[in-house]
Amino acid sequence: MFAIVRTGGKQYRVAAGDKIAVEKLAGEAGDKITLGEVLLAGEGDSLADAAKVTVSAEIIAQAKSEKVIVFKKRRRHNYRRRNGHRQQMTLLRIVSVA
């Protein structure tokens, strides 16, 4: 069975056993959480009532994503700025979709 869940402003298609990286969620590695907002659920071609479906996940780790470099430059004015940013994220293992 699969489900479409929304967390951190993004939507993910998940099934039992999947690993996903989402925006940072509160909790430590090993904690069990429930992903609240299930938008769609089904199996194969048939769809189930999403209101009755719960998605359980386990936090694998709290990590940071790849670094994004922001570089600003104004030509002929000797103006250069270089900034880096690493977004915090949570790695999840989907335990069950029921």
From Swiss-Prot:
Keywords from the UniProt entry: Ribonucleoprotein, Ribosomal protein, RNA-binding, rRNA-binding
A biological process from GO: translation
Alphabetized GO MF terms: rRNA binding; structural constituent of ribosome
Keyword Plastid annotated: no
GO cellular component, one term: cytoplasm
PANTHER family: 50S RIBOSOMAL PROTEIN L21, LARGE RIBOSOMAL SUBUNIT PROTEIN BL21M
Stated family: Belongs to the bacterial ribosomal protein bL21 family.
Complex and partners: Part of the 50S ribosomal subunit. Contacts protein L20.
General function of this protein: This protein binds to 23S rRNA in the presence of protein L20.
Name of the protein described by the UniProt record: Large ribosomal subunit protein bL21
Gene name in the database record: rplU
